[in-house]
Amino acid sequence: MATQISKKRKFVADGVFYAELNEVLTRELAEDGYSGVEVRVTPMRTEIIIRATRTQNVLGEKGRRIRELTSLVQKRFKFPQDSVELYAEKVANRGLCAIAQAESLRYKLLGGLAVRRACYGVLRFVMESGAKGCEVIVSGKLRAARAKSMKFKDGYMVSSGQPTKEYIDAAVRHVLLRQGVLGLKVKIMLDWDPKGKQGPMTPLPDVVIIHTPKEDDVYIAPAQVVTQAAFVPEAPLTTTDYPAMPVA
């Protein structure tokens, strides 16, 4: 017998489930370019779509890795048998995915690359991928014992209002280095895309679109054909026409 719960409890339960699932997959698939998860609940089963840059590593050899993840999720969240299905979806453009770039920056720093060089590399790659703006913030013990933050920006970035929810893709990651923990924050501003593939379909509120004027139709009057009147010679004047006319 299905238990009845209020709408508020249902939303809270769904939010907690999504947060825990995202945390589990972030730890398991960090090295495989994990970029987010989407949960679709159908009457028959629950579908979980994992977005990653390297989907082949997520699937594993002959689908072994994805089956292990399915079993893990099923036992962790107590799903009935064969009621949950996991799929792997490749990220179309990883340069416009903040989570993928934050993970990339994290592994660059773990590999010993300088902070400034790693951040500028991420910044350049994001802008070359078609983003409208990008911001990278690294905070922690960067050089000296005193903690500080470094901010790298390029392009155009909005910071308030509804466009921040539609246009800004942000991600936060932490990396443990020898001097301590560094915090990494990547913000990417997408560009307006009427098709909705590379960015939001709704334009920014302050964007003014100037359309090219239409060409004026030039009215050409039909040519008039002037026909020359036929010359009719006049008859010579006579006394009949003018009786008072003297006769030469």
From Swiss-Prot:
Modified residues (Phosphothreonine): T212
Keywords: Phosphoprotein, Ribonucleoprotein, Ribosomal protein, RNA-binding
GO biological process, one term: translation
Entries under InterPro entries matching the protein: KH_dom-like_a/b, KH_dom_type_2, KH_sf_prok-type, Ribosomal_S3_C_sf, Ribosomal_uS3_C, Ribosomal_uS3_euk/arc
Superkingdom, taxonomy of origin: Eukaryota
Domain KH type-2: 21-92
A GO MF label: structural constituent of ribosome
PROSITE patterns assigned: KH_TYPE_2
Gene Ontology CC: one annotated term: plasmodesma
TM spans (from-to): none
Similarity annotation: Belongs to the universal ribosomal protein uS3 family.
Cross-referenced PANTHER family: 30S/40S RIBOSOMAL PROTEIN S3, SMALL RIBOSOMAL SUBUNIT PROTEIN US3X-RELATED
Protein name: Small ribosomal subunit protein uS3x
